[in-house]
Design a protein with these regions (language model features):
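Conserved beta-strand hairpin/beta-sheet module of binuclear metal-dependent hydrolase folds
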Residues: 2-57, 185-202
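C-terminal regulatory/interaction regions
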Residues: 261-280
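Residue-level marker for buried hydrophobic side chains located in beta-strands
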Residues: 37-39, 68, 91, 193-195, ...
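Active-site HxH/HxHxD metal-binding segment of metal-dependent hydrolases
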Residues: 55-157
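Short, structured coil segments at secondary-structure junctions
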Residues: 11, 86-87, 230
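Metallo-beta-lactamase
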Residues: 42-45, 144-150, 164-251, 256
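Short catalytic-loop micro-motif centered on adjacent basic/acidic residues
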Residues: 37-40, 63-69, 173-175
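Short internal loop-to-helix segment that lines adenine-nucleotide cofactor pockets
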Residues: 155-165
């Protein structure tokens, strides 16, 4: 049986989390001009839930101002395929994706060995194998990997480092390469909130500069930059929300590893759950 969609309201910062397993999507209810925006619409099935969340908050789903991706991997953009041609919503992607589409920048993506480093993160959220099944046929058809890049429509705008998001927003774009070349975060200084995409994940209540990366030097530079931001609310691309007085100051580095006991517990949970799913 599939795990239910996890919906968590964070009223102190005006955000609702919509998660299926590790596919975290964030609804920001006021981007600055009263209109909502969505960050990392990773699955097509998340869009109806996002619309329901907006209605529950007294907002018109048709007033959605933007859908933003922190980077172009399929698990952060696959939900774009659910948008209707007549949806009046801007799609915003990191500026580096423009170079990838033009062929002037190589397509780099972490390999299996690097991906295995975040398995402990995968175990912490309610497993929903059907979510993985939903995404699998979209691999290679949307977003990018090492060989392909494609999006359902031309983006309406690009995210530039240091720029504010549209709509008179207090959200600032932070280019954060390392996990990928286009990796991007969004920072909201008034609430000290960081939507980190895959630049920072979380495990056991602690931020973790992503150990799954294509460029270690860039990862180190990104970690140093993000540690300089006062962050009390971390909204990661994968993993659970982390709150605290100095979330990034206490973060693991990209070359740190959680305690072995925690990793083993996480892998055991995944193995048991997968076996139950296969025989359920």
């Amino acid at each position: 049986m599939a795990a239910p969609v996890v919906i968590r309201d964070l009223p102190d910062i005006g955000v609702t989390v919509v998660s299926r397993w590790v596919f975290n999507c964030y609804v920001v209810h006021d981007r600055g001009d009263g209109r909502p925006m969505v960050v990392d619409l990773g699955l097509p099935s998340q869009l109806p839930v996002v619309r329901e969340v907006l209605r529950d908050h007294g907002q018109d789903p048709d007033d959605l101002g933007a859908v933003i991706a922190t980077h172009g991997h399929v698990d952060h953009v696959a939900g774009l395929t659910a948008l209707r041609p007549d949806d009046r919503v801007d799609i915003l992607l990191p500026r580096t994706v423009e170079d990838m589409l033009a062929g002037s920048r190589a397509l780099r993506s972490p390999g299996p060995a690097a991906m295995s480093r975040i398995l402990p993160v995968v175990a912490e959220q309610p497993r929903d194998w059907s979510a993985l099944g939903e995404m699998r046929p979209l691999m290679g058809r949307i977003g990018y990997d090492r060989r392909h890049i494609a999006f359902p429509r031309t983006p309406d705008g690009w995210l530039d480092d240091g720029a504010s998001l549209p709509g008179g927003s207090d959200w600032t774009v932070v280019h954060a390469p390392g996990h990928t070349d286009d990796a991007t975060c969004l920072y909201h200084a008034p609430t000290r909130t960081l939507i980190s995409g895959d630049s920072v994940v979380s495990f056991e209540g602690r931020a973790w500069c992503n150990p799954e990366y294509v460029d270690a030097a860039h990862s180190a530079s990104t970690a140093e930059r993000l540690r300089s931001l006062p962050v009390e609310h971390l909204l990661p691309g994968h993993g659970l929300v982390v709150t605290g007085s100095d979330v990034m100051g206490e973060a693991w580095s990209h070359d740190d590893r959680p305690p072995r006991s925690g990793r083993l517990r996480a892998l055991w949970r995944i193995a048991v759950d997968r076996a139950a799913h296969r025989h359920g």
